[in-house]
Amino acid sequence: MSLLAVERIRAGYNEEVDILQGVSLRVEQGQIVAIIGPNGAGKSTLLKAIFGILHPKEGRVVFDGEDITGLPPETVVRKGMSYVPQVRNVFPSLTVQENLEMGAFIRRDGFFERIEEIYRMFPDLREKRHQRVGRLSGGQRQMVAMGRALMLDPKLLLLDEPSAGLAPAMVEMVFEKIREINRRGVAVLIVEQNAKEALKFSDHGYVLAMGRNALDGPGQELLRNEEVAKLYLGG
């Protein structure tokens, strides 16, 4: 049984237009799965539909064997899924420590053990735990956002464009942290414009175009695909 099964989802931001037009995908236990495609393909919309921010008009979202289609985000979180949006993913006026504490709002059991694990994973955050997040670099803020999502001890982490706007050195650090998160047993579904780097460490990838599935396969296989390389990998 797949950890996540998205089946023929149709969704949009109004009744007239469907951004997603029957998209399907799967994430198995322990996998990293990448979603790539051009701007406007529906990648971020798909994450919102999975997490319950958007209510699908058709199709199903099944998570850990349970149909969660249309459930609100606060319910989806309790079932073991966390989501890091591309923007507004931290509280800039709060400290690093306070941001992480906000992530434990529904799970107080094991709080101190989890926050220590986050600090071991992101040692820079321990050093800056009393600083306001708004004063941190973009890469450090992304670490805070991921750390806060991990405070819920999720089975699946959804990441929307985690490398957006970051310097190249910070991009590599963020990607390495994603790999580390996955090695600790958390499955990851990532939307990423840096398609080449995302596919390098992904077990499977999906290419979306105009709100539909265009292609999918193992990450390394998609890297070698001539059509994918021409359209999305700059080669």
Regions from the PLM with identified roles:
Residues 2-235:
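Glycine-rich phosphate-binding loops of nucleotide-dependent enzymes
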